[in-house]
């Protein structure tokens, strides 16, 4: 039963991660297909570039929540269903491995969207949501570093590299 619950959660988190929020928001609010404008990516950075600040931030928050919300709920309830098996086999890995696999699931969904011909974004916001669920201090620090360097330099790619480097320097 435990493996069935795990499989259900893995698939549910994958499907949740597969929702192409940038694509949906772009089509709903400005009738723009992010796949055909800007960088062609459906993630928050291209949404910011093509749709503007308000909608780009909304896409970031929704993509962030695709990682943060399910993993936070899972971590909260894991003590009830993730027990250490009496005998470890490949089919019954330890709880840490199960949580790690569940954390990867929305990332895979975002990158290989079931609703977008298995194409998606880079899963940066979703990954930040997962990191924040595991360790809020690290996640929030990364977001703050990113915001500072995005404001200073105006390039999301450069801000991402600097933010991830600084997070590793301070917490790695």
Curated annotation (Swiss-Prot):
The chain crosses the membrane at residues 6-26, 55-75, 95-115, 130-150, 152-172. It catalyses: an acyl phosphate + sn-glycerol 3-phosphate = a 1-acyl-sn-glycero-3-phosphate + phosphate. InterPro entries: G3P_acylTferase_PlsY (IPR003811). It is a multi-pass membrane protein. Keywords: Cell membrane, Lipid biosynthesis, Lipid metabolism, Membrane, Phospholipid biosynthesis, Phospholipid metabolism, Transferase, Transmembrane, Transmembrane helix. GO terms for molecular function: acyl-phosphate glycerol-3-phosphate acyltransferase activity. Signal peptide: none annotated. GO terms for cellular component: plasma membrane. It is found in: Cell membrane. Its main location: membrane. Pathway: Lipid metabolism; phospholipid metabolism. It holds the Pfam family G3P_acyltransf. Its EC number is 2.3.1.275. One of its GO terms (biological process) is phospholipid biosynthetic process. Belongs to the PlsY family. Catalyzes the transfer of an acyl group from acyl-phosphate (acyl-PO(4)) to glycerol-3-phosphate (G3P) to form lysophosphatidic acid (LPA). This enzyme utilizes acyl-phosphate as fatty acyl donor, but not acyl-CoA or acyl-ACP. NCBIfam families: glycerol-3-phosphate 1-O-acyltransferase PlsY. Probably interacts with PlsX. This is Glycerol-3-phosphate acyltransferase. It comes from Onion yellows phytoplasma (strain OY-M).
């Amino acid at each position: 039963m435990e493996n069935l619950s795990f499989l259900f959660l893995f698939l549910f988190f994958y499907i949740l991660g597969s929702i192409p929020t940038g694509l949906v928001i772009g089509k709903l609010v400005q009738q723009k297909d992010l796949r055909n404008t800007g960088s062609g990516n459906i993630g928050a950075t291209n949404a910011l570039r093509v749709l503007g600040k308000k909608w780009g931030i909304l896409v970031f928050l929704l993509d962030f929540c695709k990682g943060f919300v399910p993993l936070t709920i899972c971590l909260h309830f894991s003590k009830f269903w993730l027990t250490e098996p009496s005998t470890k086999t490949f089919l019954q890995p330890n709880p840490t491995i199960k949580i790690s696999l569940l954390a990867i699931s929305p990332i895979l969904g975002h990158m290989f969207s079931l609703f977008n011909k298995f194409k998606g974004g880079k899963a940066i916001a979703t990954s930040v949501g997962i990191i924040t669920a595991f360790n809020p201090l690290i996640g929030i620090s990364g977001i703050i570093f990113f915001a500072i360097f995005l404001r200073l330099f105006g390039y999301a790619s450069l801000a991402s590299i600097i933010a991830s480097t600084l997070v590793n320097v301070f917490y790695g």
